Amino acid sequence: HQIGTFYVKENRSDPKSRVIGIGFARYIARKPKGPPVFFLPGGPGGSYIDSVPPQFKQSGGPLLAEELLGRCDLVFFDLRGYSEHGSFLKDRAFKPKSAPPNATLQYRVREFKRFAQEVVERYRRTVVDLRGYSVLECVEDVNEVRKKFGYQKIVLRGQSFGSQWSFGYLKKYPEAVER
């Protein structure tokens, strides 16, 4: 098996974009009986990279992975910006205020918006280009790896946000999806 990092432009629409790393793991079947399965985690922040064989069940690895091991290639992704095996966005300078126990929904929404605006403003003063952190960029990450490994068609298995990521891929590259 392989565990490593692949490198992509942070923002593919910017020719001067910096390069970021994204972690992956690939398990190659000796005699595959079907197309590879790409496992896309939930998140943001989910990862399957450290829950790889033989500890799938013990570590809370993705459903079906253990059953598929050896039957087809398995490819596990980290989400860009949340990869211990690549680039990791860390913003520990801001700690949101704890909401009072009787806080209204409006208060919580207002506090979340304030939090999000402050974090975005802080990133604007760094080398990070937040325009590169979108579902569309994640879709392109999957497609680059699919092509790099020489897969014509893939099967997508997404959990939580990974399902949205899968739908985005299916919409943009239907010809590359087996199911």
Which residues fall in each region the model found?
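Gly/Pro-rich cap/lid or specificity-loop segments adjacent to the active site
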Residues: 1-21, 25-179
